[in-house]
């Protein structure tokens, strides 16, 4: 079963309190104290509901109620408490001495709420933007394109000019190489000369002399002797004689042409 009503509410006055009713209620509470709000209207001689008497005393007639406008410091405190407690006006009023919960609620609904709502909407929009920006994955920039250099082959090689050696086995081989070049040049001239062509059973063909084979045979003997450095340095006379013979190998083209003109050539 529910709680029974404080009064039958028949024949009771509703609306604003008059000054006479305020003085009657104040005198009764000072004489008998607070409490027992159900029986207070009958005992005080008021045609009001017990709840209405209680609210009138707590919100307007108490001697410790702070009158006047709410200061700026009280507004900041109300805003902070409202963020923590919400619409629990009685708890907020308990932290503001001299202010009632009804007064704070009315002031919030008429003044503070209108000031705070635009700020809260701006803050909420900023928070949403920050959350969206945090939720998005960071855009990774594409890696820079690598510059590939084309390999270029060096066609020219610059090397310091070296003077030819003046001692050792390579120095001994220089006249041999020069004589070999002279023999090859002479052989090419012989092949181009028409006087050096002889008739044989197969036709007219240029006569080729085996200077190259003979030279390689002699040169092989020289190189084999040069492998042993001790023998080369001991027998200088033999090497000089070989160079002289090799120098005489240069043929006289005119004498060779006269030899080929002879009829007794086989």
UniProtKB/Swiss-Prot annotation:
Endpoints of the signal sequence: none
> GO molecular-function annotation terms?
DNA binding
Q: Which residues bind DNA?
A: 37-61, 89-112
Superkingdom of origin organism? Eukaryota
> Alphabetically, which GO biological process terms does the record hold?
positive regulation of anthocyanin biosynthetic process; positive regulation of DNA-templated transcription
Name the tissues where it is expressed: Expressed in the inner pericarp of maturing fruits.
Where's it found, cell-wise? Nucleus
Q: Which GO terms describe its cellular component?
A: nucleus
Q: How does it assemble?
A: Interacts with BHLH42.
This one is known as Transcription factor MYB123
Q: What is the lineage of its organism?
A: Eukaryota, Viridiplantae, Streptophyta, Embryophyta, Tracheophyta
């Amino acid at each position: 079963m529910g709680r029974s009503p404080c009064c039958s509410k028949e024949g009771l006055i509703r609306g604003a309190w008059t000054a006479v009713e305020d003085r009657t209620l104040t005198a009764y509470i000072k004489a008998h104290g607070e409490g027992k709000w159900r029986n207070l209207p009958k005992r005080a001689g008021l045609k009001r509901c017990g709840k209405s008497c209680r609210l009138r005393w707590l919100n307007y007639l108490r001697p410790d109620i702070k009158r006047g406008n709410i200061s700026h410091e009280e507004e900041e405190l109300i805003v902070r408490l409202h963020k923590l407690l919400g619409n629990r006006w009685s708890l907020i009023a308990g932290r503001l001495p001299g202010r009632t919960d009804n007064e704070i609620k009315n002031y919030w609904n008429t003044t503070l709420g209108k000031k705070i709502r635009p700020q809260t909407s701006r803050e909420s929009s900023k928070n949403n933007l920050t959350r969206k920006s945090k939720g998005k994955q960071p855009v990774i920039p594409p890696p820079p394109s690598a510059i590939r250099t084309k390999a270029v082959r060096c066609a020219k090689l610059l090397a310091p000019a070296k003077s030819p050696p003046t001692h050792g086995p390579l120095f001994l081989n220089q006249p041999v190489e020069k004589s070999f070049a002279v023999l090859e040049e002479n052989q090419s001239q012989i092949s181009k000369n028409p006087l050096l062509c002889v008739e044989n059973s197969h036709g007219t063909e240029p006569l080729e002399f085996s200077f190259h084979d003979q030279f390689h045979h002699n040169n092989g003997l020289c190189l084999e002797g040069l492998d042993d450095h001790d023998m080369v340095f001991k027998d200088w006379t033999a090497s000089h004689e070989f160079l002289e013979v090799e120098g005489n190998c240069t043929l006289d083209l005119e004498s060779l042409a006269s030899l080929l003109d002879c009829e007794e050539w086989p």
